[in-house]
Amino acid sequence: SLVGSEMCIRDSHPAIGYIGDDTGENISERNANFCELTGLYWAAHNIDSDYIGIVHYRRYFASRKKSRFAPKKDRVISHEELCSILATTNVVLPRERHYFIETNYTQYIHAHHKRDLTATRAIIARKCPEYLPAYDMYMSKTHGHHFNMFVMKKELLQHYCTWLFDILFDLERELDMTGYTVNDRRVFGFVSERLLDAWLITNNISFEELDIVYMEHQNWLHKGTAFLKRKFFPKKDD
């Protein structure tokens, strides 16, 4: 689906022929804060399929059969190959992202706001404390499954979404975003990336991993410099 469709219509952007996330039960109008999660919410509530997945316009799952040096569009996994993988697993994820010199916790607070995670942890402790050990373990690690990319059996995805949005909607009500930039206000998308592994670990869910195809040019030098700058010269937070 086309995420943020309600805002596209409001801002008079031309239609491009995709199903919007503003049909049926939806939270499309909250896309500025929830990012691709408005599409995930829409899919969980409006699609009747055995498996449901989410990728991005600039990130796709890669075929295991194609060379890393093949043209990017040719490296995107085919329907047939993905189905063959799903015949042996209920969940497909991107390979873990490794920070090496940062934990998942320190990477987040150096890039965003510490209060986001403080509030999130308090909500988990209050609403579903059985997830707290896995959440804390994930935050202490230097790697994890990020990007909000996955394919899941529908029943699992609905379970995940019920749990995820229950936390995020409480966070939306409780979080003070005074002084947040436009990027900071995408907080619920950022936080959700840090919740997936806690859900997987607590529910003992197995999965398969795939590489990612980046459709846009990746300036790794710029990304690495920004990463180090955030670590050694973090912005002040409350």
Q: Which residues does each predicted region cover?
A:
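Short, small-residue-biased leader/transition segments that mark boundaries at the very start
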Residues: L2-I9
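Active-site-proximal specificity loops/subdomain of glycosyltransferases
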Residues: R10-N46
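A solvent-exposed, charged loop/short amphipathic helix patch at secondary-structure junctions
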Residues: H13-G24, K66-K72, F165-V182
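Short aromatic/hydrophobic "clamp" motif used to bind/position activated sugar donors
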Residues: I52-I54
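Short acidic donor-binding/metal-coordinating loop in glycosyltransferase active sites
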Residues: H56-R59
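Conserved donor-nucleotide/metal-binding helix-loop-beta segment in metal-dependent transferases, i.e.
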Residues: A62-D116
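Catalytic core and acceptor-binding pocket of nucleotide-sugar-dependent glycosyltransferases
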Residues: T120-N219
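Membrane-proximal basic amphipathic "stem/tether" segments
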Residues: E216-D238
